Structures are given as C-alpha cells and as structure tokens.
Regions:
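Membrane-embedded segments
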Residues: 118, 122-203
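N-terminal Sec-pathway targeting helices
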Residues: 55-74
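Acidic-and-aromatic substrate-binding clefts and catalytic sites of carbohydrate-active enzymes
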Residues: 147-151, 276-279, 305-313, 432
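Membrane/wall-proximal cationic-aromatic binding patches
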Residues: 77-141, 149-156
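N-terminal targeting leaders characterized by basic, low-complexity, disordered sequences
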Residues: 1-44
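Short acidic-hydrophobic catalytic motif
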Residues: 399-422, 426-547
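Secreted/periplasmic serine-hydrolase-like ester/acetyl group-modifying domain
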Residues: 186-295, 378-398
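C-terminal regions of proteins
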Residues: 315-385
Length: 547
C-alpha cells in the first residue's frame, strides 16, 4: 500500500519537472530589444553627437569673434596712437619741441643703462648718450620734457625704474628751479607711457586734472581728443615727421645752428624771475630723492651751460642739494667751462640751449666726471654690439646734418670726402681771391690739380667719386664735363668764370642742383641712396672773415 503511494508521488513530480534542454534554452536565449527601443537609442546618440558638433561650432564662432574683436582693438589702438601723433600740437617756431621721445625706453634691454638723464629741452639738446658711450663705455638714456617740472620728472623716473636699474640719475637743475607747468609737453610724454597706475597718476597730477569733469579729463589727457578739431590745420609734415626714427640716439636731438655769445642780450637773459623753490617742487623733489634712495640709485643735479642761468638760481638749487646730500654740478661757472674748453662763440644753439658742438663738449665732461666717481660694470657683447650699431647710425646722421649746415669749407670737404659720395664742383664768377691756405689744402686733399688757384676768375668743372678725381677741367673759358658712374645716373657740370659767361650748372638726372651763385658751387650725391644730400655755395671770392 505504501509502495503504491510512493509511486504516485514520483509520477506527480515527473509531470511537474521541466526538461533540462528547455531550461538551458530559456537561460541562454537573450531577449532582443524592440525596434522602437533601437530607434530611440540611435536617435539619442545622433542628438548627442549633433549637440557636440553644435557646441564645437559655437566655440569656434566665439573664438573667431574674439579674434576679430582683439584685431579691431589692436588696429584701433594703433590708429588712435598714430592719429594722436598726427594731430598733436607742433611748435612751428621751435622745431626741437616736436621730437621728444619717451617710449624708446621699452625697446631697451632691461637693466642695460648705467646712467639715466632726466630733464628739460636743455638736456634734450645738450647731452648725447652715444658720445659718452663711445668715449667712456657708459650706457645711458636721456628722458626729457620741455619745461619739465619736478612732478613730471618724478613720474618719468618712476616709470624708467620699472625697466632699468641705473647706478646714477643725473637730473637737470632747471627741474628743481621750477617755473610754469607745460601741460602740452607733459601730456605728449605721458601718452607714451605704458598703461599702468603710474600713467594715470601722472596724467592726473601733471595735467592738473583735479576738479575736472570726466569729459574735461578725457579731453585734457589724450592728444586725439585735445586736438580732434584741428584737421583743417594739418600740413604734410604732420603726417611725414617721425620722431621714432631718431630713437637710437637715446633721447638726444642734434642741432647745428650757432648763436654766438656776443649776440646775446645777457642783461635780460640773466635776470632772475624766481627766488625760492615753491612748495609743490620741494614736495616732488623729496619724492624723487626718496625713490632714488629706495632703489639704491645715486642722484646728481647738473646744470649745463646756459646764458639764462644766474647766481640766484644756482643758490636755490645748491641749498636744496646740500640739505639733501645730493651732488650739484653747475657747468655755467667759468672754472668748469675753462676745464671743458667750452667756447661761448661756437657752442650755443640759442641763449638757453647747446648746439652739437656744445653738446659734445658737455657730454664729454659728464662722462669723465662719472668715470672718475663711479665704477660701472662691463656689458654683454650683445649690448655692446647694439650700441656700436646705434653709434654708427648716429655718426652718419651727425655728419649728414653738419654737411648740410656748416659754413666752414674745410669741414665740409672733410665730411664730403666719403667713399659713398660723388662731389661735383663748379665755379661761377670767381672762387680763388679769398681762398685761405687751409681751404686750398682741403681742396688739394680731394686730388684736385690746384693750378686753377693762380687764375683770377677762372672756370672749374670737376667730379670726384669715392675720393678719386674722375674729371677736372679748368681754364679761362666756359667748360663742361659729363660723368655716368652707373646706369641711370647722369651728371653734367658746367662752369663759366666772370669773363666766360658767369654761370654755374650741376645737373644730375635732368635736374639742376647748383646754387648758381658767385664762388664755389658744390653738390654732393649719395650713391647708396641715389639722391643729392647737399647743395652748397661757398663764396671764396670773399676773405674768411668777410663771409
């Protein structure tokens, strides 16, 4: 009975048992996703991919816009700067005021200056850093503003010391003496500062902006806004003059005009107009001294020769210097001028400024003084090479300027006798009666046959190329010669003494360059530039003291 029951239970279990192969199939077979789900997932992936592409496109668009904005701002800044320079006030009566440059500071290698000179137009025209470097190896830069006052000098020094670590700062004595605040000149200099807190402080304090409205501040602070109404007064020179072309001279402006000391009105020039340092000047001079002490820089105050300086000014500045333990060099004193071999008759541009002759003498004295009192470190070869290149450019510019202005025939010949130059000579009327022996020697140094000197009112047509005479014709008749040194350069020289036609002509490439006046007409042609660089007349019919 029990066996029958057990058998029934097993039969029942077998009916409920699932075959093994079916269990395995059910376990192994995965459920395939529906078509809707596949389409949905594919659609989601496409959306994400499209969103990524759109995001990248937007980023690229934003980047392009950013580049365009940056380019626009850069172009605007450059245009604004150039227009500001074009519109800036130009001094028609005193050209030197138009060529102050401050921003050459940012092109100098950092900490490459041994000495920094800061001052007025007197330093601008009276100190030539490249001559000091050539003679003494001292690197220096001159940073100047017309009628520079102590507050302007303070901010210039502050800006310079961000980029240079000089051993000495030489400050113009006219700065502490004080005077009227030249806002036009100060603005022009400050606008060359790099954008910084110093620049805005300088604008505010040097341009007297306290109490001004925002519009007034903008109009006073920037050349463009200050002179935006002056379009109708612009001349070609406003667009063509480029002060940056002289930046290699390190803040120096070479001038060749000469005012003899005997022509000056000394009693008027030397009359004092100030008798004590004003409160604002004392304040900023104190700041200058404190800044120099903080940076470990020695401060020297120096006055260059000037007929507009007097014992009152010297006493004012000297007392401040003594109280603040600052060295004061007054080169207006006769004892210093004797040491310098300073010639009052040849060294002045006007009553208050030196010409190139005086500048070289004063610079030599300063260089010697600095060498005797300071030990300067040697410079890297890179800096030495750079200064050598700048000096050579300065020397060429110097010779060119003197060649155009000198009244000394011997000096002119010395400068014109250059391998790169062609010298053309033509006599009209007579050029021999007043010739000095030294002038004859100079002409002979060119290789000329001097037989013409013994002939009164003789004709002379000659061409010297690179120091060699290529053609010379002289006699009592009208004479002419031609010379073609190379293709597209044709020279014709004609000379007729007083009795032979009384004429001078020097034609180069079809253009007349002779002054056609009595005496020795000379034209100098620069082969490297393919242009005439000087056309002069020396009336050597007159004696030297009569010219």
């Amino acid at each position: 009975m029990q066996d029958i029951k057990t058998q029934e239970q097993e039969t029942k279990l077998q009916k409920n048992r699932v075959p093994v192969d079916k269990i395995e199939k059910k376990t192994i077979v995965e459920k395939k996703p529906s078509m809707k789900k596949v389409q949905k997932e594919a659609s989601t992936g496409d959306v994400q991919k499209e969103a990524t592409i759109k995001k990248e496109r937007r980023a690229c668009t934003h980047l392009k816009r950013l580049v365009k904005v940056a380019a626009f701002l850069l172009i605007f800044a450059l245009t604004f700067s150039k227009l500001s320079e074009v519109l800036a006030f130009k001094n028609a009566s005193y050209e030197a005021n138009n060529y102050y440059s401050f921003d050459y500071l940012y092109d100098l290698p950092k900490n490459s200056l041994d000495v920094v000179y800061v001052g007025t137009s007197q330093y601008h025209m009276g100190i030539t850093p490249l001559e000091i470097w050539k003679e003494y190896g001292i690197t220096g830069g001159s940073f100047n503003v017309a009628q520079c006052r102590a507050w302007m000098a303070y901010y210039m020094i502050q800006e310079v010391l961000k980029y240079q670590n000089p051993k000495v700062i030489v400050l113009d004595a006219a700065v502490p003496r004080g005077g009227d605040n030249n806002i036009l000149a100060s603005r022009r200099a400050i606008n060359q500062f790099r954008c910084s807190l110093t620049k805005f402080q300088a604008l505010y304090n040097c341009l007297e902006l306290e109490g001004s409205t925002i519009d007034e501040m903008i109009n006073k602070s920037f050349e463009f806004f200050a002179y935006h109404d002056s379009w109708d007064t612009l001349e070609m020179a406003d667009f063509t003059d480029d002060i940056s072309s002289l930046e290699y001279q390190k803040g120096y402006l070479l001038t060749t005009k000469c005012m003899p000391y005997s022509d000056m009105a000394h009693s008027i020039d030397q009359k004092p107009t100030r008798f004590m340092l004003d409160e604002k000047t004392v304040d900023y001079m104190g700041r200058i001294k404190a800044l120099c002490d903080e940076k470990g820089v020695d401060l020297i105050i120096a006055k260059l020769p000037s007929d507009m300086w007097n014992i009152t000014y010297s006493g004012m500045v000297g007392r401040w210097a003594k109280e603040n333990e600052v060295e004061f060099l007054d080169l207006t004193q006769k004892q210093f001028q004797r040491q310098m071999h300073f010639d009052n008759e040849t060294c002045y541009f006007d009553e208050n400024h030196l010409n190139h002759v005086g500048a070289e003498i004063a610079s030599n004295y300063l260089g010697n003084y600095l060498t005797e009192h300071y030990q300067f470190e040697s410079h890297s070869q890179e800096i030495e090479d750079t200064w050598k290149i700048d000096y050579e450019a300065y020397e060429a510019y110097r010779d060119f300027r003197i060649l155009q202005s000198t009244q000394d025939l011997s000096e002119f010949i010395e400068l014109a006798n250059n391998p790169n130059y062609i010298i053309c000579l033509s006599i009209r009327d007579d050029a021999t009666k007043g010739l000095a022996d030294s002038e004859c020697e100079s002409l002979q140094s060119l290789g000329l046959n001097m037989r013409f000197v013994d002939r009164f009112r003789t004709s002379l047509a000659a061409v010297i190329d690179g120091g060699s005479v290529v053609v010379q014709k002289d006699g009592n008749f009208a004479l002419s010669c031609e010379y073609e040194p190379y293709a597209n350069c044709e020279i014709q020289v004609t000379s007729a003494g007083y009795s032979a036609g009384n004429k001078s002509s020097i034609v180069i490439n079809g253009k007349e360059y002779s002054k056609n006046k009595r005496g020795l007409n000379i034209v100098v042609y620069d082969k490297t530039k393919d242009e005439v660089i000087s056309s002069r007349i020396f009336d050597t019919w007159l004696m030297q003291d009569e010219r």
